[in-house]
């Protein structure tokens, strides 16, 4: 188990009926969240640069929210949020596990940024949504080449 579980972009913008990801992914993400103590779960929400700050972002329907540790980002990598970086550093974090969406975009960028920040990084594919499976082979190759621990299989 990593020091922290980062749940990336599991929000209604991406995970809902009619979207690329739906209930099956939410159930898998919830199963993973349940394996961590609540104080070790961090949620990352994406806010597009054009969105108003006073518009509250909504988690995916039925997502298990066990922590008030919620950080927003407006770029692909969650490490563009200095508050997240300060929180992780201030808590002596050594290892991070990632789940969420999309494996080729925000999860990918966050994983690679975490490696550059010198964290031990793991990804549980059973709780990662990937819209483009073919492109994901390149992502996996890159993660392996950077020493990321990859476990589980995509849904």
Where is each model-derived feature located?
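Structural recognition of alpha->loop->beta junctions
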Residues: 62-71, 131-155
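Short, glycine-rich nucleotide/cofactor-binding loops
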Residues: 18-22, 99-104
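Active-site acidic carboxylates
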Residues: 1-75, 85-86, 90-94, 148-149
